[in-house]
């Protein structure tokens, strides 16, 4: 049930990204303060939805939910908790969710700390971030679903790639993504 909640949260985030891409941009074009003002709440709501999805994937790893293909391919019940959690972003699907969560976090940060920006500029920035989010979310939902189920579930997973079982994996991708993905705000 939790993986389905995570998948639903991704779909909800995609719908919010569509709205974030259109309404603020349209408001900036028309000079409509109400539509431009929708950018911040949409950005925060999208961040919350993606965070719920990421948390659902972490939950699947921590609880060894072997009905999720991603968990079977990248986790094992005998792994230490650190490598179960870092295994979430040690694969293609999980790293994409981390990517969009960081991007949505940057969008939410613009919403929270960009009050001094002109409203038309903030609306346009949020619209562009919404478009980027939508592209990545569509890719995840349609081609790289991390919540895909398998039945019957195997007794245990294959485990994380041994090359990725390093403390550096715990900190390297999140820090790299904060810097790498954060530059999307400047565009």
Residue ranges of each PLM-predicted region?
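Polytopic transmembrane helical bundles with strong interfacial aromatic enrichment
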Residues: 1-187
């Amino acid at each position: 049930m939790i993986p389905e909640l995570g998948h639903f949260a991704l779909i909800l985030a995609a719908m919010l990204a569509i709205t974030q891409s259109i309404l603020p941009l349209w408001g900036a074009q028309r000079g409509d303060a109400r539509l431009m003002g929708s950018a911040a709440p949409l950005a925060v709501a999208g961040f919350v939805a993606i965070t719920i999805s990421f948390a659902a994937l972490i939950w699947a790893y921590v609880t060894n939910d072997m009905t999720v293909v991603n968990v079977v391919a990248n986790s094992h019940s005998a792994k230490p908790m650190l490598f179960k959690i870092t295994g979430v972003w040690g694969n293609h699907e999980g790293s994409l969710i981390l990517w969009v969560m960081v991007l949505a976090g940057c969008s939410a940060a613009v919403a929270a700390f960009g009050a001094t920006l002109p409203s038309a500029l903030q609306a346009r920035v949020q619209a562009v971030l919404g478009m980027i989010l939508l592209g990545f979310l569509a890719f995840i939902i349609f081609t790289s679903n991390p919540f895909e189920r398998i039945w019957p579930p195997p007794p245990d997973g294959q485990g994380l790639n041994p090359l990725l079982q390093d403390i550096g994996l715990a900190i390297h991708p999140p820090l790299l993504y904060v810097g790498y993905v954060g530059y999307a705000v400047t565009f």
